[in-house]
């Protein structure tokens, strides 16, 4: 029998990048929906999937993407749009639910945010809850998972914790650092998303998912610091405006300002599991604790594991912050040679240089504040050095 076709929306995002390989390993056919398919070119699994260019904010692009689809994963958000994104998210969800119904899709699986709908919520968290409600308003059965902080290399919330903890020996923070969170390992999020495909107990339900324990946000940062061997102290500084925190996060982490602003605003309420029905509905999911998830994330801060999001088929030099590393990429066009990786452990962090026949890529994983200062102070020299190496066969 031909395996069912699974559509993954938000294919260039973090969750999709971890879900798609697991779907392929499980024998499913996968179609990836992306506004810009070029951003998928460098993924190891690109040649194993069907890629369709579409946009959930443009309803006329959806019928072709949904044709022949058995189950669709709804993994998109519009926080990067900035002002007005919440209305756009609801309109997109409504259009997607309608298009899925017309295409004969049998199941929608949605990953939303973990929060108490009865509390006063920031726009980001309220929108996540309302998006699920809109999807469930259609005729296609919807399984909704609500998750808080996702612990894994590349997760937006985890990268905020990582970079802020690495950067500041004394971490200032607003009062919401005392709020509670129940983080869940990325492996377990994917376990739940996969289990929903075949487990009939979950079809049509809303499930709050979290890890084994509850922590304050300050605890999460201190536990990360302990895993990294960093000494960190926290102090609360009430009255720090959200825009100021978001600006700092955007400057020092891979998270863009509009997303940082929305996420930080969402930290004003607790994010804990109050209804643990997922544990009974999906007993096949074995939960991993936060410390183990952090250790796994740190092990993935290595070129062997980092998603090549910068390989989009477009020539030119690229600079980015991604999955715990600063990355410089330069096309070389030497036309010959075999890829070589050089590694150097320095006082301020870990350096890797990948030398290929067509490009050179420098990875730097900083160790604490000295690592950040080293990178930024010597940033122009890193480019000069990489260009010099790029001219050598």
Model regions and ranges:
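Mid/C-terminal beta-alpha module of Rossmann-like enzyme folds, strongest
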Residues: 2-5, 195-262, 270-334
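Substrate-positioning beta->alpha
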Residues: 92, 156-157, 176-197, 205
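N-terminal Rossmann NAD(P)H-binding glycine-rich loop of SDR-like oxidoreductase domains
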Residues: 3-28
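Beta-strand/loop substructures that line and gate deep hydrophobic ligand-binding cavities in soluble
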Residues: 348-380
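A conserved amphipathic terminal alpha-helix motif
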Residues: 374-393
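Glycine-rich "substrate-gating" loop/helix at the edge of Rossmann-like oxidoreductase active sites
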Residues: 148-154, 175-186, 210-213, 284
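NAD(P)H-binding glycine-rich loop region in Rossmannoid oxidoreductase-like domains
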Residues: 38-103, 113-117
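Glycine-/Pro-rich loop/turn segments that contact NAD(P) or position catalytic residues
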Residues: 78-167
